[in-house]
A protein has these predicted regions:
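Short, small-residue-biased leader/transition segments that mark boundaries at the very start
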Residues: 1-7
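Hydrophobic core positions within the conserved protein kinase catalytic domain
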Residues: 9, 13, 61-64, 167
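A short, N-terminal amphipathic alpha-helix
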Residues: 10-23
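Glycine- (often His-adjacent) and acidic-residue-rich active-site loop
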Residues: 18, 29-63, 79, 109, ...
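Crotonase-fold acyl-CoA enzyme core
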Residues: 65-178, 206-210, 215-218, 224
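Short C-terminal tail/terminal secondary-structure segment
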Residues: 225-231
């Protein structure tokens, strides 16, 4: 995962967010690896001043986390180091049975540097995060699901079709409601419970001004599928 790939990811997210016809993005890699981490050969000669001036890694990757539309991480094979951090920037992770997660940067004499220590701790707690970050061990998909890092596991054979079905289910909803709900959930990690509930209530009330709310509730009463217009 070199700098060119990071820039490409940022541009893809920019285009996705601007395109009104797109309602859900799947971020994935190959069957063997979601992403096996940063390009170590590219990193090796860098100095402190190099990485500081470049805002190395996070400058482009954080665009995934800041996207207002939903992004699903579809993890098959290895998601190590920066790959695991990139997956955690997505809204939720779906893993294949063969998926493996890890933050092995400690083996290189450094720490995670793209949000790994912060997001991992929020997702799975201090003890498990310390375990992964200090030992560099890999975590199997089953363990990742059991502690909440992964939302669900799909079979290797049906993985691609299964993830696409999930994305279609997300995309079928009102994009306005989806974006607001995403904003609410993300706020839970950054504020107190009382403030979070107030924030949720304000956005919930604002949805009553949308045409999609009118359509969604009318469709429910009339026992038909809603036709959302994202308005």
């Amino acid at each position: 995962m070199g700098s060119e790939m990071c820039i490409r990811d940022r541009l893809e997210v920019d285009n996705y967010e601007k395109d009104e016809s797109l309602r859900c993005m799947i971020l994935t890699g190959s069957e063997k690896a979601f992403a096996a981490g940063a390009d170590i050969k590219q990193m090796q000669p860098k100095t402190y001043m190099d990485v500081y001036k470049e805002d190395f890694i996070t400058r482009n990757w954080e665009r995934v986390a800041s996207c207002r539309k939903p992004i699903i991480a579809a993890v098959s094979g290895y998601a190590l180091g920066g790959g695991c951090e990139l997956a955690m920037m997505c809204d939720f992770m779906v893993a294949s049975e063969s998926a493996k997660f890890g933050q092995p940067e400690i083996n290189l004499g450094v720490s995670p540097g793209a949000g790994g220590t912060q997001r991992l701790t929020r997702f799975i707690g201090k003890s498990k995060s310390m375990d992964m970050c200090l030992t560099g061990r890999m975590m199997e998909a089953e363990e990742a699901e059991s502690i909440g890092l992964v939302s669900r596991i799909l079979s290797n054979d049906d993985f691609v079709d299964g993830v696409v079905d999930i994305a279609k289910e997300v995309a079928d909803k009102s994009l306005v409601a989806t974006m607001m709900t995403k904003e609410m959930v993300n706020r839970a990690y950054e504020t107190t419970l009382a403030e979070g509930v107030r924030f949720e209530r304000r956005l919930f009330h604002s949805m009553f001004a949308t045409k999609d709310k009118t359509e969604g509730m009318a469709a429910f009463v009339e026992k038909r599928k809603p036709e959302f217009k994202d308005e």
